Amino acid sequence: INKAIKESKIPGAVLWIEKDNSSYHQQYGKMCLTPAPKSMQRDTIFDAASLTKVMATAPSIMLLVEEGKLSINDQVTKHLPKFKGVQKNKITIKQLLTHTSGLPPVLPLKPEWKGYEQAINLCYSADIRNTPGRHFRYSDVNYIILGEIVKRTSGLSLKSFSQKKIFVPLGMKDTGFTPKKTKIHRIAPTTKEKGKLIHGVVHDPTARAMGGVAGHAGLFTTADDLAKFCRMIINDGFGADKKIFKKQTIEVMTKNQTSMFLHKVRRGLGWDIDSKYSSPRGDGFPKLESFGHTGG
């Protein structure tokens, strides 16, 4: 981390390493360099970007599975009747979770659009690129649709559902969508766009156009809160002295669900097991015995 900071690859970072009952939590460098340098803090809040998929969206879907409100083998049209077409009618929730739906990677930003419902309509009209179940393509569109399924099935927005069912029970007090302005001093900016610093709002342009709440991006969190979430996953769904998920649910989420691709791609339900996106795991995590997520 210090080397990356010295080489100006990153301004700073917060590191959490945990094994058994020991943990290491430390901040490094700066949380921002402009308009004025500001030191990184252990409780700095970050734009979690694509971690939204595995911290909010996929877990919310699986909680609805536990509640008997849907099945991962359901066709998407069962829950979103407007999502239809010759090939689209075949797409299942599982294929959305594993990025094997055949849908495009992103929604078009041109011509310019704005609003959550507009994004959902663009998902409805998106063209299929491959036969569902035949090809792996990391896709934000998959998770935008999953976020809408959470909303339609539960009656709550993804923001409210994940807060109520996951983040509050785990004591993740600094995790959520659309952070309050009172926390702006703790939030690390991301980058500049058209000369303006992106700070306190989601960096992803599609999620921003949707109002900050989307299934693929938009979540903000801290290293401390992320550790609480990961600890719960590792402990078979048990965290903060309560059961968040059934053990079987965690096993299904972290098991290879794309065996049809033989050894080329291994994906769980949301989680990455072995694909071209797995390289950050380094040498410390066994290739087929670990899982994680970075993005695409």
Predicted regions and their residues:
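Short, glycine/proline-biased beta-turn/loop segments that scaffold the active-site neighborhood
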Residues: 72-86, 168-170
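Residues at or immediately flanking beta-strands
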Residues: 12-14, 75, 135, 176
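Active-site SXXK
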Residues: 1, 21, 45-73, 143-151, ...
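Flexible, Gly/Pro-enriched loop and linker segments at secondary-structure and domain junctions
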Residues: 292-296
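Short, surface-exposed loop or secondary-structure junction motifs
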Residues: 25, 32, 86-290
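Short, conserved catalytic-motif segment at the N-terminal edge
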Residues: 1-48, 69-71, 118-121, 126, ...
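Generic hydrophobic/packing signal
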Residues: 59-65, 80, 97-104
